[in-house]
Amino acid sequence: NILSELVLSFRDDFAKYRNKVPSSRIDATFRSIAEQGLGKFVYNRVDTDASTAQIKTATETLILAGLVYPVTHSSANGIPLGAEINEKYRRMILLDTGLLQRILNLDISVILSSDDIQVVNRRAMAEIFVGTELVKSASCYSPYPLYCWHREKAGSNAEVDYVVQLGTRIIPIEVKSGSKGTMQSMRLFMEAKGITQGIRTSLENFS
């Protein structure tokens, strides 16, 4: 299987970076990024006895290698979006949905056809797909930073999956893995920022 061979090849290559951090730490971090899926990436959830500093180094190594893309919170009050980031809140996505499927041993036919099985994994795959498509749409000569917006408030957390800059405009993107789902977070964001346009991706047909 090509995907299995790719995963094995990546893991073999981790040994090249052992002068920075042991390859076993990188491998554990790589798998944890796949397993954690949605939401903020939590370093102490990596299944290893390594220190947080080592896990952070392993994560940055994976980012520099292009195997992982960070999605960083931006307050998004204006452009550039990178001017108001908070790296304490970052999601991590793999570079490919097929790799996520293989690492987690997921049955892709079940995920695509079922309405209620493995919903978390399906949502993660949808977010990865949109994020990687955003990266592909940019120039190959410079890294394309991914941003999100997150608000933590007692009883009223909110998150917009992606926030992008289009010319001088800020556009929120809400990712839905099915045909249903509210857009409360995006509406809240748009009202707070005075934005009139946003994008919602889902399995719904165009109307």
Task: Annotate each language-model stretch with its function.
Residues E5, L38-R45, V71-T72, G78:
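Short, charged, low-hydrophobicity "junction" segments
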Residues S23, D49-T52, A124, I128:
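Short, solvent-exposed loop/helix junctions and linker helices
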Residues T57-S207:
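A cross-kingdom feature that marks ATP-driven nucleic-acid transaction machinery
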Residues N1-K40, I63-G66:
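Interdomain motor-coupling "hinge/lid" segment immediately C-terminal to the ATP-binding subdomain
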Residues G39-I55, T59:
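Amphipathic alpha-helical scaffolds
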Residues S4-D12, K16, A28-R31, T48, ...:
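Charged/polar, solvent-exposed surface patches and flexible loops
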